Structure formats: structure tokens, C-alpha cells
């Protein structure tokens, strides 16, 4: 029978993944992604953060390879959390493939610690004192006659803060509307149609959503936004609205080894945006170098700099991926999509498999934050470098990073902001 996992995520931007479960051998599933952060011990938090970063960059490289000339936006944490939730109900090789595909070493990290880590991460991201607006959670929509194992139900509730709802999948249109309305409400209308279609074989839909709205610590002035050229490559350009800020003090690093500049813009809460601007023609070199050690180096070597002028496009980009077709199998997650899938930890009454993993994401960046993001960081007692200007007028990478959880919430490649 079919099991759908849907993940949804919004970054005043929105991303949503969904997973659908059907009878074995059928293919019909959505996934919407969600993000999490860890609140366990410092060591456990660092381990989960490093693993999630490894997964984020590995997934990014797959997406970039298959979509070389398009915009990319996704929530790696949303995807990994949704798949980890599925693994709660998986056994044997099915479970091992999922967790190892997420970059966990099961000989070093027990399965229980992985789920506890994600649970702590979810809890830490839900702290009301965080000035960023973050809404994350999970929901299960269960066929009214399907008997879910009590242990799975309880673990998803306790560890992943999952709400449970009954649905009549024999009425697929009504069930689809129920799920999409729920996701739309949780993501402030950013993701309006996570699930495009269901059929009567569906038994369960798992939704994982994240909504993030960050306000720049120092906002851009809308009156300073002007029309400017954005160079798609050496021969093509487009006109885009370009935000401008003068005499900005923020953290910056020039990576000569990788031929790129890294700039940090902070939000008012615990998140910041890392903007990576490769030199002309060096994007592939930077992409190939992405790994946890690269991120640690950048964050460690960023230092306060005064920028005479910063230009950053105002943009909105969206992506929609079918991850079960090739991306996840290439990362080692295969059996869960086949008749051999063992999801007997979810229910013993039906034989389930995952038929589709769909990830939907939206990212808006404007003058006030993400939906736009801007920030500054000044460290007293440290001499600041002075940079004449930084122009994001060619393809660049955009990473939303939660400093407390040391985790990547969103990652994007802006090839064309128009």
C-alpha cells in the first residue's frame, strides 16, 4: 500500500516535502521538507550539525549537477528530518539505507540517538524567544481504517512533534484539499498546493513543513533599490531590482584558495545568511569544494569588515523536485521505494512502500529580511578591513544558517534572480 511523505518549508520562503505510501509496486508519493535543530548535549549537537551539513552539501551537488543552469532552493534539514521520521517505522536494510543516506555512521551513532537529536533540534527551533519567525512541525494524515502501531504513533509525537489526523483517501480530492489547506495555513500561504494529486491506494501522508521569516538586523532602504544588470554568464545579462547599502560593517572573508568571497548578513534572531560569491567562471570549483570543513573554515575566518557599498538582488525563487527518481537512490536510499521495503514499524496490517518524494521550496529576499535578509556584525577591539564594494551581480550561493543549532536551514543557488 502507498505511503506519502510530504515536506513543506517556507523561508518567508517556503519549502514543503511530502511522502506518500501506497501498496507495494505502485508509484505515487510526495515529500515536503522540514528543518530541525538539536538541543541535546554539545557533543551530540555538533555531531548532528556536522552530519546534516554533510547531507546538505551532498544533496546540493546532486541537484546542481542535474539542474546546472537553473535556480536551486531547498531545505536540507527539512528533507533529512522527514526521511529520519520515515526511518522510525523502517526496519532492517530499509532503515539502514535511509539513515546512512542521510550521512549517519550507524556503527558510531545509535539509531535512538539520531531520533533524539532531531527531536532536540525541533524543540530548539520552536523557542518562542527567538526573534526570527520560525514555524516547524510534522503531521500525519492516516486512512481512517488504517491501524498505526502505537509505538510509532507515540515516537513521532514525542520526538518529532507530529500531529495526527484521519483522512478518507477513498475521496482523494477531499483528502488532497485537507492536506494542502493544512500546509498552506502552517506556511502562511507560501505553499498552496503541496500535493497535486492522490489516488485511492494512498493509506498515509506524512507532512513536514517549515516556515521562516527573518528580519535583517540592518535593513536595506527600499528607496535605494535600483535597476541593474545581473550577468548570467559572460555573454548574457538581465535587468533586476538591486538593493543597496552603504558603509556596512559585517563579517567577510576572501577565500583565495576557492576564488570566492563570503559575506555574512545577520537576522535579528539566531539566524544569519551566508552569501558566497564565486569569481567569474569559478562556480563549479566552489560547488565541488562544499563540505562540512569548508563551512567551518568560512565561519571561523569571517572577520568584521567595512564595506563601502553592498549590492544584492531582490529576488524570489522557487523549486520543485522529485527526489525518489534518481537523487535519493544515487545517495543510497533505494529499498524504501521498492516492493522489498520494510516499513513494518508503522503498521502490521498493510505492506507499505514509499512511491514519491516531492520537495517544494520558495525563497523570497527583499529589503527588510528573508523574505529578505540583512545583517551586521561588529566585534569590539578588532581592526576592521575596508572593502570598496561587493556586487552580487552574477550567480551566487545563499545559505540560511541557524547559529544556535549550527545547522543549515535553507540553501539556494541564484542563477537568475529575475
UniProtKB/Swiss-Prot annotation:
<comment type="function">
    <text>Contrapsin inhibits trypsin-like proteases.</text>
</comment>
<dbReference type="GO" id="GO:0034097">
    <property type="term" value="P:response to cytokine"/>
</dbReference>
<dbReference type="InterPro" id="IPR023796">
    <property type="entry name" value="Serpin_dom"/>
</dbReference>
<keyword id="KW-0325">Glycoprotein</keyword>
<protein>
    <recommendedName>
        <fullName>Serine protease inhibitor A3K</fullName>
    </recommendedName>
</protein>
<feature type="region of interest" description="RCL">
    <location>
        <begin position="369"/>
        <end position="394"/>
    </location>
</feature>
<dbReference type="InterPro" id="IPR042178">
    <property type="entry name" value="Serpin_sf_1"/>
</dbReference>
<feature type="glycosylation site" description="N-linked (GlcNAc...) asparagine">
    <location>
        <position position="270"/>
    </location>
</feature>
<feature type="glycosylation site" description="N-linked (GlcNAc...) asparagine">
    <location>
        <position position="185"/>
    </location>
</feature>
<feature type="signal peptide">
    <location>
        <begin position="1"/>
        <end position="21"/>
    </location>
</feature>
<feature type="glycosylation site" description="N-linked (GlcNAc...) asparagine">
    <location>
        <position position="105"/>
    </location>
</feature>
<keyword id="KW-0964">Secreted</keyword>
<dbReference type="InterPro" id="IPR036186">
    <property type="entry name" value="Serpin_sf"/>
</dbReference>
<comment type="similarity">
    <text>Belongs to the serpin family.</text>
</comment>
<feature type="site" description="Reactive bond">
    <location>
        <begin position="384"/>
        <end position="385"/>
    </location>
</feature>
<dbReference type="GO" id="GO:0043434">
    <property type="term" value="P:response to peptide hormone"/>
</dbReference>
<dbReference type="InterPro" id="IPR042185">
    <property type="entry name" value="Serpin_sf_2"/>
</dbReference>
<dbReference type="GO" id="GO:0005615">
    <property type="term" value="C:extracellular space"/>
</dbReference>
<keyword id="KW-0722">Serine protease inhibitor</keyword>
<keyword id="KW-0646">Protease inhibitor</keyword>
<dbReference type="InterPro" id="IPR000215">
    <property type="entry name" value="Serpin_fam"/>
</dbReference>
<dbReference type="GO" id="GO:0062023">
    <property type="term" value="C:collagen-containing extracellular matrix"/>
</dbReference>
<dbReference type="GO" id="GO:0004867">
    <property type="term" value="F:serine-type endopeptidase inhibitor activity"/>
</dbReference>
<dbReference type="InterPro" id="IPR023795">
    <property type="entry name" value="Serpin_CS"/>
</dbReference>
<feature type="glycosylation site" description="N-linked (GlcNAc...) asparagine">
    <location>
        <position position="39"/>
    </location>
</feature>
<dbReference type="Pfam" id="PF00079">
    <property type="entry name" value="Serpin"/>
</dbReference>
<keyword id="KW-0732">Signal</keyword>
Amino acid at each position: 500500500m502507498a505511503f506519502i511523505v510530504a515536506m513543506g518549508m517556507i523561508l518567508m520562503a517556503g519549502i514543503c516535502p511530502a511522502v506518500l505510501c501506497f501498496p507495494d509496486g505502485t508509484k505515487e508519493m510526495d515529500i515536503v521538507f522540514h528543518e530541525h535543530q538539536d538541543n541535546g548535549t554539545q557533543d551530540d549537537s555538533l555531531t548532528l550539525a556536522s552530519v546534516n551539513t554533510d547531507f546538505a552539501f551532498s544533496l546540493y551537488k546532486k541537484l546542481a549537477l542535474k539542474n546546472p543552469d537553473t535556480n536551486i532552493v531547498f531545505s536540507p534539514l527539512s528533507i533529512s528530518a522527514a526521511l529520519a521520521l520515515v526511518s522510525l517505522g523502517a526496519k532492517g536494510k530499509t532503515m539502514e539505507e535511509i539513515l546512512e543516506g542521510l550521512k549517519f555512521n550507524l556503527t558510531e551513532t545509535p539509531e535512538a540517538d539520531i531520533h533524539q537529536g532531531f527531536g532536540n533540534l525541533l524543540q530548539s527551533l520552536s523557542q518562542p524567544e527567538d526573534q526570527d519567525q520560525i514555524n516547524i512541525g510534522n503531521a500525519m494524515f492516516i486512512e481512517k481504517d488504517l491501524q498505526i502501531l502505537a509505538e510509532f504513533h507515540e515516537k513521532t509525537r514525542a520526538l518529532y512533534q507530529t500531529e495526527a489526523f484521519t483522512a478518507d483517501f477513498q475521496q482523494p480530492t477531499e483528502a488532497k484539499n485537507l492536506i494542502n489547506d493544512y500546509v498552506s495555513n502552517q506556511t502562511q500561504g507560501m505553499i498552496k498546493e503541496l500535493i497535486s494529486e492522490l489516488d485511492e491506494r494512498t493509506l498515509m501522508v506524512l507532512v513536514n513543513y517549515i516556515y521562516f521569516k527573518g528580519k535583517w538586523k540592518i535593513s536595506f532602504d527600499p528607496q535605494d533599490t535600483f535597476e541593474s544588470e545581473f550577468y548570467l554568464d559572460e555573454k548574457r545579462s538581465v535587468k533586476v531590482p538591486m538593493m543597496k547599502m552603504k558603509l556596512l560593517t559585517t563579517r567577510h572573508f576572501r577565500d583565495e584558495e576557492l576564488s570566492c568571497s563570503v559575506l555574512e548578513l545577520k537576522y535579528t534572531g539566531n539566524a544569519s545568511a551566508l552569501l558566497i560569491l564565486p569569481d567569474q567562471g569559478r562556480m563549479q570549483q566552489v560547488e565541488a569544494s562544499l563540505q562540512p570543513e569548508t563551512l567551518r573554515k568560512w565561519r571561523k575566518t569571517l572577520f568584521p569588515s567595512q564595506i563601502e557599498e553592498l549590492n544584492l538582488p531582490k529576488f524570489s525563487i522557487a523549486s520543485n523536485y522529485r527526489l525518489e527518481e534518481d537523487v535519493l537512490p544515487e545517495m543510497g536510499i533505494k529499498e524504501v521505494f521498492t516492493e522489498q521495503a520494510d516499513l513494518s514499524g508503522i503498521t502490521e496490517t498493510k505492506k507499505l512502500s514509499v512511491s514519491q518524494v516531492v520537495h517544494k521550496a520558495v525563497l523570497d529576499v527583499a529589503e527588510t529580511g528573508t523574505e529578505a535578509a540583512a545583517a551586521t556584525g561588529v566585534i569590539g577591539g578588532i581592526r576592521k578591513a575596508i572593502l570598496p564594494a561587493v556586487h552580487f551581480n552574477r550567480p551566487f550561493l545563499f545559505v540560511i544558517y541557524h547559529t544556535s543549532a549550527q545547522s543549515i536551514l535553507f540553501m539556494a543557488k541564484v542563477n537568475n534572480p529575475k
